[in-house]
Amino acid sequence: MSRSPRKTPKSPSLQLGQAVEWPATPDAARLDRVPNPQAGTDYLVRFTAPEFTSLCPVTGQPDFAHLVIDYAPGAWLVESKSLKLYLASFRNHGGFHEDCTVSIGKRIAAEIKPKWLRIGGYWYPRGGIPIDVFWQTGKLPKGMWVPDQGVAPYRGRG
């Protein structure tokens, strides 16, 4: 017997299900959160953004990264459409690789207060040097399984 899908009513406070303009800047972007229906269970959520872009704050040239965001949720989850819009807001933002990566991790952590969060920013080379940036909050919950982020050391990533 098939089960009918749960219907969640549209919420005017969420961007999900709404026509939304792309935010002009990361500060203007809104990150939405939704209640975690499995709040009593330790588990891992992974977001992968293999085509993240920002701008060099000095030259204005585009910078490209493969971001991997892992977190152990508490009471809240990041709503994925709002995360997509937030990450896209960096497209015209001038920021060094380190600042972009750490700012994203801190912003998500501040919004949802996870039990644990880490971000890996694997930046493609500019001037022949790839830059990888890693940041995390606190300690991983005991017994939590966290797979490798799966981004190979630079040899022409892809």
From Swiss-Prot:
Keyword tags: Cytoplasm, NADP, Oxidoreductase, Queuosine biosynthesis
List of catalytic residues: 56 (thioimide intermediate), 63 (proton donor)
Residues given in the record as substrate binding sites: 78-80, 97-98
Pathway entry: tRNA modification; tRNA-queuosine biosynthesis
Listed EC numbers: 1.7.1.13
Subcellular location(s) of the protein: Cytoplasm
Gene3D superfamilies xref list: 3.30.1130.10
Source organism superkingdom: Bacteria
One Gene Ontology term of the molecular function aspect: preQ1 synthase activity
Membrane among keywords: no
Primary localization: cytoplasm
InterPro entries: GTP-CH-I_C/QueF, NADPH_dep_7-cyano-7-deazaG_red, QueF, QueF_type1
Catalysed reactions, semicolon-separated: 7-aminomethyl-7-carbaguanine + 2 NADP(+) = 7-cyano-7-deazaguanine + 2 NADPH + 3 H(+)
GO cellular component: a single term: cytoplasm
GO biological process, one term: queuosine biosynthetic process
Stated role: Catalyzes the NADPH-dependent reduction of 7-cyano-7-deazaguanine (preQ0) to 7-aminomethyl-7-deazaguanine (preQ1).
Family indicated by similarity: Belongs to the GTP cyclohydrolase I family. QueF type 1 subfamily.
UniProt-recorded name of the protein: NADPH-dependent 7-cyano-7-deazaguanine reductase
Organism listed in the record: Rhodopseudomonas palustris (strain BisB5)
Record lineage: Bacteria, Pseudomonadati, Pseudomonadota, Alphaproteobacteria, Hyphomicrobiales
